[in-house]
Amino acid sequence: MTFSVDIFSRFIDNYGDISIPLRLAKGLYIEHGVSSNVFLTINKLSQQILEKNLFNENINIFDIDKMDNNFIPNTNVVTIFDTQLPACYEALLSHKNLLINYEYFSAEQWVDGYHLKESINKKYKKIFYIPGVSENSGAPVFSLNDMGLICNEKRKDKIQINFFCYFNENIDASIKVLNTNFPQIDILQHDRFDKNKNRTNNLLSFNDFDIALSASLINFVRGEDSLIRAILAGSPFIWQPYIQDNNLHIEKLNAFLDHYFTSLPPQLREIFLLWSNQGLNLEHWQYLLGNIENLKYFYLEARDKFIKRGTGIGQIYSLFIK
């Protein structure tokens, strides 16, 4: 079935704001032949991200803040993280339109009761798509054909650790302990910036970032899209959720640890929690590096269970063709 979809997302400070809609558009075309109009916040950083990633003529990129008032909506629409539609666009929607709102990833139990629920909106049909880890939640946006999945095993044995995180003094101190005691390990810090540095200096394309994760011994990742990429890479990872008030991100982290892994060694749970709250000392690095082979099998087992549920690209497409 051939059709097009309109995808909306505002890029604020989270790479998922731009990577998720673009990965969705790419996957819909490659796997199902669906072309997309992707409406994004266009600024200096998003422009540089777009330049790093090549898209064919079946993915059209538009500035969400400069929408043509005469643009005719497609029947199928996706908003990422409940992006507010331009008023001129929303005014043209009717009961013939299906809007899928792709929500934030969560492993919390409430997701099961809200995934695929319809909004009370009377003008057009709106469905809440909530990605998570349970059977009753949605699958996140990813493709089994992503390049990060096809790196060979030799690359995974490279002594390299990736850090894509919300840097702070505790994390800086943790990395210093690692560097001092394990100088043979290459440390890669992604999106490391401050007031005097250009954030775009170390940007990678989506494919190159996926490959970097697959080639790494351990990955420290942040936010949503990078968590999914780390899961697919198959290497051990430590996740740092987006930091929220009242330690709500710790509740989100605990829910993920409880439901994603079949059984979690207490030392590993402690490392996850410390990474989001405090930092790691020599004892924690010794545990991770000293048990790396056992941890690899542990993470691969969890990944294989995770991807058996299907992909968000396939599930969203299925909703469109119902």
Where are the predicted features?
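A conserved mid-protein helix/loop that constitutes part of the nucleotide-sugar donor-binding site
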Residues: 19, 168-176
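A nucleotide-sugar donor-handling region in carbohydrate enzymes
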Residues: 103-171
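C-terminal amphipathic helix plus adjacent low-complexity
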Residues: 262-322
